[in-house]
Regions:
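Short, solvent-exposed beta-strand edge segments and adjacent coil->beta transition regions
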Residues: 15, 143, 203-205
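Conserved nucleotide- and phosphate/pyrophosphate-binding catalytic cores
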Residues: 22, 154, 160-334
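Short connector loops/turns at beta-strand edges and beta->alpha or beta->beta junctions
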Residues: 46, 135-139, 194, 253
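Internal, conserved structured core segments that host functional sites
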Residues: 114-166, 170, 190
Length: 334
């Protein structure tokens, strides 16, 4: 990895399918970041174990997520792409940070309380200490910036707390990581049924997945929620309509978007025509990503090499951190 650049760390879920919200909310910004930062991007397979995924699915999930990220534009030559479980130093730092974490603060984390409410039959220690493992993911590379969503901001605050506690007790080692601010580049994609963020939607027909077929993309967009049109010129635009225009602005020629915006303002818009235009433009945008990801998944040897090379880069960084941490704590005996 290049020296002199700020270090960025971010995790990629190994469960579920990547969708358009992931692409425009995170992956597209990762692609920009890889030019200017030392980036460590990992597939969070250890984190997924809190939900006890079927072992026979885990490898395929990791390969698929890796392939979709590379197909979207992440360059393994510019970033470290690795599986979390390939870096044993993360597990060791997780253990050390647990000695600086307190039961009371972990139980107060909103995401933990949500999990307890939603899955009371599986309140395991991994769920409770999830923020500690996330902190180890970040601090093991001494990252200074972390792209996180709103639901992860408290976890990042805890990572700063653990860094402060370690530094105060043993000596300066960890920078206090801050959230990466994407500014105007942050795009929030809503579900097609107008019920909230695409990432939170439980309606598969309201979510555009990166592996959707052309026909499924068209079908989903044609079913997207609309209304009867503006009641008067200049009327406020409902969220569901604004979301369609947001999607158009991302994949459609500016002059075409402008024509539909004008039609909306003068109350002549035909949503069916707008959806057909958006559907074709979305197919043209998503199909190359899907096709490249599918091709990559047919070459497991290539993906294995990416993971192996990424792990080597990540371990080189992590080993230095753990060596320094052990020395400061006093557990270097020879």
């Amino acid at each position: 990895m290049a020296t002199g650049k700020e270090i960025v760390v971010s995790g990629i879920r190994s469960t579920g399918f990547l969708h358009l919200g992931n692409y425009f909310g995170a992956i597209r910004n990762y692609i920009r970041m890889q030019e200017d930062y030392n980036c460590y991007f990992f597939v969070a397979d250890w984190h997924s174990l809190t939900t006890h995924p079927d072992p026979k699915d885990l490898r395929g999930n990791v390969y698929r997520v890796l392939a979709e990220n590379i197909a979207s534009g992440l360059d393994p030559e510019k970033v470290a792409l690795y599986a979390q479980s390939d870096i044993p130093e993360i597990a060791e730092l997780y253990l050390l940070l647990n000695m600086l974490a307190y039961k009371g603060e972990l139980e107060k984390v909103p995401t933990f309380k949500d999990k307890v409410r939603l899955q009371p039959q599986n309140v395991n220690a991994g769920l409770l200490t999830y923020p500690v493992l996330m902190s180890a993911d970040i601090l093991v590379h001494r990252a200074v910036k972390v792209p996180v969503g709103k639901d992860q901001e408290q976890h990042l605050e805890m990572a700063r707390n653990f860094a402060q506690r370690f530094n105060a007790r043993y000596g300066e080692l960890f920078p206090e990581p801050v959230a990466f601010n994407f500014g105007d580049n942050l795009v929030r994609i809503q579900s097609l049924d107008g019920t909230g963020k695409m990432s939170k939607s439980e309606n598969e027909m309201a979510t555009l997945y990166l592996n959707d077929t052309d026909e499924l993309i068209r079908k989903k967009i044609m079913k997207a929620k609309t209304d009867s049109g503006p009641a008067e010129p200049g009327a406020p635009m409902p969220d569901s309509i604004a979301n369609l225009f947001t999607l158009m602005q991302l994949v459609t020629a500016p002059e075409v978007v402008k024509s539909f915006e004008n039609a909306y303002q003068d109350q002549t818009i035909r949503y069916g025509d707008m959806k057909k235009q958006l559907a074709e433009d979305m197919v043209n945008f998503m199909a190359p990503i899907r096709e490249k990801a599918q091709a990559l998944q047919q070459d497991p040897a290539y993906l294995q090499n990416i993971l192996r090379t990424g792990a080597e880069k990540a371990r080189a960084s992590a080993a230095q951190t753990l060596q320094a941490a052990r020395k400061l704590i006093g557990i270097n005996y020879y």
